[in-house]
Amino acid sequence: MNSQQNKLPQQPQQPPSSIVDDDNWKSQLKLPPRDERRQTEDVTATEGNDFDDLHLKRDLLRGIFEKGYVKPSPIQEKAIPIALAGRDIMARAKNGTGKTASFLIPALEKTDPTKDVIQVLILVPTRELALQTSQVCKELGKYMNVQVMASTGGTSLKDDIMRLYNPVHILVATPGRVLDLAQKNVANLSNCHTMIMDEADKLLSQEFQPLVEQLINFLPQQRQILLFSATFPVTVKSFKEHYLQQAFEINLMEELTLKGVTQYYAFVEERQKIHCLNTLFSKLQINQSIIFCNSVNRVELLAKKITELGYSCFFIHAKMVQAHRNRVFHDFRNGACRNLVSSDLFTRGIDIQDVNVVINFDFPKHSETYLHRIGRSGRFGHLGLAINLITYEDRFSLYKIEQELGTEIKPIPPVIDKSLYAA
């Protein structure tokens, strides 16, 4: 890296925190404690590049290292240079392997904070993911003066309109809300040359695709589109052919499930499930767990039962008031509670590092749902456990999901080795 190019100009108004000495800037970083947990090849099988090799702005590197990132993961190593070169990307990588940073880092690098226009639009399918992504973006860009805004349905439209009177450089949003703002001429996307779609398979489902296609009409002709997902159904491929220019394809999905997640099933009758769950709670070394149910009603009933058994428990689902959902998400992430009962609202992209156990209280019908659920444990190459409670009616779904994902879900042993999932 050319050290002359990287030196910041010495100007009298430069705040003292701007580090000018090339040899000295790393020694002044405020690094978090090093995570010494063992990691799997999902994040360690790289070509050996460092973040320093990516020719990023000094202030962005400071944010990256202070966030605790040490070296780029495989998806980051592949995607960041291509995104910085301005190519469209269609990237497929497992959940929990660093996808978010692989698009946030180039987004921040390419943003010019001196221009008071929206330059990057990041679309996500859920409100929780929008809040999480915008928070990570703010943390990575904390020295860059880049203004990041999250905008989602379920919150005050008036507040969003007021916020957009001030500069916003990167907008993280759900499709319906940002389309509403664009149609009202409040969110001006005419200078937004980069659109990123996280969880692209969900964004291109029947629910969202018409909104996404309308949004593209508000973008300039010269634009870059980045698609990131763990699964790429036919809808994504046809969207790519229609809207992406000579997209660079990245596929890090030789196998679909995370290497660090051990999967078990237990055959139970419906009426035995609570008893089985109680046994698991007493025997497992749980840091934090997420327990999935197939309906909103069952989420609330199960959370009540778990609390009656004497275990700390929150619940979250799509029919809750947004402010309540935000509070549950925030408190659970901060470790206020050990167990969270959830509907499939909470399967996509949500990153809580302390979750080491996922329990499918109700087994899902589709392999895609299963994949996203178990990806809540074993985040960023760490170890995790997925336990599936299987009724007689679920046996065909179990077989189908094993076949479709090419994975093995084993019968649960009498004792589970703690080294498989506990740091």
Swiss-Prot record:
EC numbers, comma separated: 3.6.4.13
A GO MF label: ATP binding
GO CC annotations on file: cytoplasmic stress granule; nucleus; P-body
Compartments it resides in: Cytoplasm, P-body; Cytoplasm; Nucleus
Motif placement: Q motif: 49-77
Domain Helicase ATP-binding intervals: 80-250
Comment, domains: The Q motif is unique to and characteristic of the DEAD box family of RNA helicases and controls ATP binding and hydrolysis.
Family: Belongs to the DEAD box helicase family. DDX6/DHH1 subfamily.
Name assigned to this protein: Probable ATP-dependent RNA helicase ddx6
Species, as recorded: Dictyostelium discoideum (Social amoeba)
Gene field: ddx6
